[in-house]
Swiss-Prot record:
GO terms for biological process: phosphate-containing compound metabolic process. The gene is IPP. Expressed in metabolically active tissue such as root, shoot, embryo and aleurone. SUPFAM superfamilies: Inorganic pyrophosphatase. This is Soluble inorganic pyrophosphatase. It comes from Hordeum vulgare subsp. vulgare (Domesticated barley). Its EC number is 3.6.1.1.
């Protein structure tokens, strides 16, 4: 089978309900970086229990006004900006390794737990829901999870019983508005939808790994 036929066959197997992101230079540069230390997006395992239980790399600490994010080229956590006003991140925030979403980034996760976690650390989390978000016209959904090793939170399997705390998460909309950015947060979706979204992002990542190896 020719390379063109192989590409066409792979495209035919993609889910038609969601558009696939283009394999851009930002992704390719991080995929090709193998000369230095481990890259948290590509080298850390997602975990054997995924999509239900999975590893999360923490980018932003609970209670922080500093927005950190992964530098995709180096694999380091960099400072992006400091939030406006008194808005802080209500929970630890990070991403799931070896996943890929339509915005060309790994899947975002908010992790509910008792303590703040240092940026660059990773932990085990369990999906309990999904927060649909539109950020400046683009889909930017967030997985809502609990720390699987926190005795205060690990028994939760659905977001319904955590609704009061989840309202804090919707304040993410506030900090965007303070920066004159249009963002909309819809009603929380159940854990089954979250697991489906994670599985889709895992499949999309695997597809692009294969594609990058052909180039």
């Amino acid at each position: 089978m020719s390379q063109e036929d192989s590409t066409s066959a792979a495209a035919a197997q993609q889910p038609t309900s969601r558009p696939a992101p283009k394999l851009n230079e930002r992704i390719l540069s991080s995929l090709s970086r193998r000369g230095g230390g481990a890259h948290p997006w590509h080298d850390l395992e997602i975990g054997p229990g995924a999509p239900a239980v999975f590893n999360v790399v923490v980018e932003i600490t609970k209670g922080s006004k500093v927005k950190y994010e992964l530098d995709k080229k180096t694999g380091l956590i960099k400072v992006d900006r400091v939030l406006y006003s008194s808005v802080v991140y209500p929970h630890n925030y990070g991403f799931i390794p070896r996943t890929l979403c339509e915005d060309n980034d790994p899947m975002d996760v908010l992790v509910l737990m008792q303590e703040p976690v240092i940026p660059g650390s990773f932990l085990r989390a369990r999906a309990i829901g999904l927060m649909p978000m539109i950020d400046q016209g683009e889909k930017d959904d967030k997985i809502i999870a609990v720390c699987a090793d926190d005795p205060e939170y690990r028994h939760y399997s659905t977001s319904v019983s955590l609704l009061p705390r989840l309202q804090e998460i919707k304040r993410l909309e506030d900090y965007k508005k303070n920066e004159n950015k249009e963002v909309a947060v819809d009603a929380f979706l159940p854990a089954t939808t979250a697991r489906e979204a994670i599985q889709y992002s895992m499949d999309l990542y695997a597809q692009y790994i294969l594609q990058s190896l052909r180039q």
